[in-house]
Regions:
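Active-site-proximal, substrate-binding regions of enzyme catalytic domains
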Residues: 26, 36, 44-82, 126
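Active-site neighborhoods of divalent-metal-dependent phosphate/nucleic-acid chemistry enzymes
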Residues: 74-116
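Short, flexible helix/strand-to-coil boundary loops that buttress conserved ligand/catalytic motifs
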Residues: 16-17, 53, 90, 122
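Short, well-structured N-terminal submotif of metal-dependent ribonuclease cores
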Residues: 1-40, 54-61, 135-138
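Acidic, PIN/NYN-like endoribonuclease modules and their adjacent C-terminal/linker elements
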Residues: 2-4, 72, 104-138
Length: 138
């Protein structure tokens, strides 16, 4: 069975906006499309990504890109208990805490982000890697 990964907004934006880390994020997205990885995001990742895509490309193109991504990436949600756990955690960034604890709740294997601060806060049950570091593991 393919590894389950949570993909943070910055990774999707690197790919969709062709930012500096585009080539690495493209490799990761290709593995997802090829079915070698199962990818997950939350509704807030859709929101964040949609916001920046709309600013860059307009609403119609943003929706088109998001719908294409959601062909291969599943949306998972946070519940009340997960939100409480996230808010009681040592993480000071509330958004990151909600994403991380949602992924933990859904038994995701790896959390992929370019956020260096979040990478330092991982617990053994859900390791956090940059896209490149994760690809190096494969």
């Amino acid at each position: 069975m393919a590894s389950k990964i949570f993909v943070d907004a910055n990774v999707l934006l690197d790919f969709s906006l062709k930012r500096d880390n585009y080539s690495v994020s493209k490799q990761l997205i290709k593995l997802i499309i090829d079915g070698e990885l199962q990818a997950f995001i939350t509704p807030s990742i859709v929101h964040i990504t949609g916001y920046w895509l709309t600013k860059a490309y307009g609403a119609d193109k943003a929706k088109q890109i998001l719908l294409q991504l959601l062909t291969d990436i599943q949306v998972i949600d946070c519940n009340h208990a997960v939100a409480i756990n996230a808010l009681n955690s040592k993480m000071t960034d509330i958004e990151d805490a909600l994403q991380y604890y949602t992924a933990l709740h859904h038994k995701i294997n790896f959390f992929i982000t370019e956020d260096k601060d979040l990478q330092k806060l991982a617990i053994p049950n859900l390791p956090v890697y940059s896209s490149q570091d994760f690809l190096n593991l494969l």
